[in-house]
């Protein structure tokens, strides 16, 4: 299907220094959506993909009209720069001064954790996309928080499916903040047979992995059986190149495994043919009308395929529009919450459902095996099988 280009949406951009109190007067004919994300900072690439997907998703879900129940959708964009204090302040400004009815974001788990209490203070929904840490819908959760993005447990359980086995020794290499630590914790809980022999945590902006990888090698080199390093890493300086340069498989029989990633990061996956893991999204995997629309329209508009976080942004937009359609455009928080709890909606990944217990979107993950295809600059994650929501016992970690 095809819709006319985006013409009718008003976008208001903001940074930390903008958005003076009362700068925007709310109209009854508008639905105001704040999108707080990393337009700059260490996760800039992720944030920009989310924004692209979100705008495409609004276009798709509204049939190109950018309205719901006769009300214009107004998106107020704010750059948190990947900094928790800025994200917290911007969300308060969005709810308070900009009169946002609902907010989406952020990119970083650290920023998200700072923003959660703001949603509770203003009693307005924050739809988290794409921040991953379990604690967002776990011990730090409040009832105003929904999430379309996957959580650490969904990453971990699906990767455990791909890696777990008798006699397998696993070392983890992760960033030393909420995303990395929650990811490792969830992965350890998900393993049934394999044993964790080492956990390595490095600063987010690490570019020299020599010492960290050496500690992993020292812990693993004499272990019998299959040996795997699981990488849990976000941002522009992933360790895959450093791992490939050491040729650990050939020298020491140590495999590398990881989840999906953005296409530029997956260029280094080409050095690991046969590597297995589980991904949230790769444009060539899901076969459904929503993904077909996304791929076709993204190619048409940008001459490239949609990336990992583009799908997440689109999923968040579809969820919002579907909820607003069901309320007849009513943005009252209580009505939206009742509508969204248990709500199912179609996304580029397939069907998602907001679990009533913690508002986490239950969704499929995709077990892949990397193929070095000369037609692509990146290692292609070929589908082994879809891991459906009912196969993953995703823990409920919050308290209501």
Model regions: which residues?
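Extracellular/periplasmic Venus flytrap/periplasmic-binding protein
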Residues: 86-89, 134-135, 142-246, 284-293
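Beta-alpha junction/loop-to-helix N-cap segments that form part of ligand/metal-binding clefts
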Residues: 30-32, 45-52, 60, 64-138, ...
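Short, charged, surface-exposed loops that flank catalytic or proteolytic processing sites
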Residues: 325-338
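Extracellular/periplasmic periplasmic-binding protein-like sensory domains
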Residues: 240-314, 325-327, 374, 380-400
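Periplasmic-binding protein-like
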Residues: 94-107, 127-129, 170-174, 223-239, ...
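Short, low-complexity disordered leader/linker segments with a strong preference
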Residues: 1-32, 399-400
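Solvent-exposed, acidic/polar segments of extracytosolic/periplasmic ligand-binding ectodomains
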Residues: 31, 273, 341-400
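Glycine-rich, charge-decorated loop segments at or immediately adjacent to ligand/cofactor-binding or catalytic sites
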Residues: 136-143, 208-209, 262-274
């Amino acid at each position: 299907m095809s819709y006319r280009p985006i013409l009718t949406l008003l976008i208001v951009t903001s940074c930390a220094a903008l958005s003076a109190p009362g700068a925007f007067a709310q109209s009854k004919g508008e639905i105001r959506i704040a999108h707080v994300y990393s337009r700059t900072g260490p996760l800039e690439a992720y944030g920009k993909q989310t924004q692209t997907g979100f705008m495409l998703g609004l276009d798709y879900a509204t049939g190109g009209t950018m309205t719901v129940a006769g009300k214009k959708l107004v998106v107020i964009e704010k750059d948190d720069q990947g900094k928790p204090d800025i994200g917290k302040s911007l969300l308060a400004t969005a709810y308070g001064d900009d009169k946002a009815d609902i907010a989406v974001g952020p990119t970083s788990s650290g920023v998200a954790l700072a923003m959660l209490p703001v949603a509770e203070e203003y009693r307005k929904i924050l739809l988290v996309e794409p921040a991953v840490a379990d604690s967002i819908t776990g011990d730090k959760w409040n009832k105003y928080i929904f999430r379309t993005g996957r959580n650490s447990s969904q990453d971990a359980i699906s990767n455990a499916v791909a890696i777990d086995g008798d006699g397998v020794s696993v070392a983890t290499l992760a960033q030393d903040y909420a995303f990395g630590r929650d990811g490792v914790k969830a992965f350890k809980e998900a393993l049934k047979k394999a044993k964790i022999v080492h956990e390595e945590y490095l600063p987010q902006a690490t570019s020299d992995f020599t010492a960290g990888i050496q500690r992993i090698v020292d812990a693993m080199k004499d272990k019998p059986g299959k040996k795997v390093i699981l990488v849990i890493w976000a941002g522009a300086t992933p360790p895959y190149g450093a791992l490939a340069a050491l040729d650990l498989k050939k020298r020491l029989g140590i495999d590398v495994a990881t989840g999906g990633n953005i296409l530029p990061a997956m260029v280094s996956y080409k050095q690991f043919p046969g590597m297995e893991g589980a991904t949230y999204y790769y444009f060539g995997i899901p076969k459904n009308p929503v993904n077909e629309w996304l791929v076709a329209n993204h190619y048409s508009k940008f001459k490239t395929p949609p990336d990992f976080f583009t799908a997440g942004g689109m999923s968040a937009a579809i969820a919002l529009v579907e909820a607003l359609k069901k309320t007849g455009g009513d943005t009252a928080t209580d009505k939206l919450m009742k509508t969204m709890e248990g709500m199912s909606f179609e996304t580029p990944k397939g069907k998602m459902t907001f679990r009533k217990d913690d508002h986490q979107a239950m969704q499929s993950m995709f077990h892949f095996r990397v193929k070095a295809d000369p037609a692509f600059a990146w290692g292609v994650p070929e589908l082994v099988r879809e891991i459906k929501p009912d196969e993953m016992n995703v823990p409920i970690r919050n308290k209501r």
